[in-house]
């Protein structure tokens, strides 16, 4: 623990950023208002859905902030109407929202300045050592075949708001800003208890989206920094000859190495790689820890994680919630995929002179599939099929035009194929495609009071092209010269689209009714 504290202290920002005076500048709140208007997500604008920015109200807010008893009255009377002890609900709502958004912009400044590191600096800031979430795909493709055990951990959240403030003290040395942050958090939660209900978190996140997102990202950054430290401590030097670079895994390494030239007849270069015993990757609120060590090594890691989380984050983690799975004997779920690393056996016949040998070869293979039961359950909940997967019509869409009905069904099908394009087995996806296609045909037939066969004969190829997915177009270009290629075959090529991390449990593609 002392070693981690020393490592963390070394990575802290040494500069003193005094950002509190910026809260008294009018242009800060203009920036906050401009951010809300131009944001990618629909949010409520200042002043109870009033999209007009009032410079006069901002000036009044700054004048009130200069008063000596401004914050004292707000803290001592938290049960009065909204924030800032104002009798008018409109002014109180406006002041609360605009002050929160302005503070969120101000508190982000030390983190933005830390990213602009000087070229002569040797130490890299710790947030630049963290991995991109897109690294999960090469991690699964390149690393998993060489690992033995896996642990699926959910990042503990929510935690006490005081822990979030203490984490920000690593890079924000401005004490008044931290006190102001405590004031905001004290207003939206019970300060003397651990947050176990999501009511206060939801209220705070809804009214302070930028500030709540900043706090959560800071917390996840510290949690991942802790995993990065543990990963570095578990690394070992492994001797690797230059001849082994024929393996693909060594080409994709992004770790520091050094070469030592030994004098001799052949003058061969020997490389030393920092080979970590523990690998991790994070996505959403989950962390995957995988190791090539033994089961005893994994159990020690599990105990260490539980104790460290309790000490550093003051959060109790139940040990039974961290499950240890052997990759070759179990499946695991991530991002809506069901994955496994089975061992396939191949019988190879070799001939040496006049003798024949049968060699039993065992190879690992990384398989990803789309889980059929949850996806069919989602389609059933959206009233596209029954619980057993039998397609039915969707009466609520019969008032739409034929083109809108085709477009909606085709869009859902393309989104499903796009999200699960990384599956090595497409059987489940083609089953979902059949359900959506027949449900679309029955919906159109019900609208025109006709039979399904008659309507499909009338549409012909137009109906089929609407369900021709983007992934199949890619494969048609790849295998244009193949004569006997079928899209409904068992091809196992995977295409990972990096934008699928923005889709949460396939809710968006299915809620079109």
Curated annotation (Swiss-Prot):
It holds the Pfam family Intron_maturas2. One of its GO terms (cellular component) is chloroplast. It is found in: Plastid, Chloroplast. One of its GO terms (biological process) is mRNA processing. GO terms for molecular function: RNA binding. Disulfide bonds: none annotated. Keywords: Chloroplast, mRNA processing, Plastid, RNA-binding, tRNA processing. It comes from the Eukaryota. Usually encoded in the trnK tRNA gene intron. Probably assists in splicing its own and other chloroplast group II introns. HAMAP family: MatK (MF_01390). Belongs to the intron maturase 2 family. MatK subfamily. This is Maturase K. It comes from Astrebla lappacea (Curly Mitchell grass). The gene is matK.
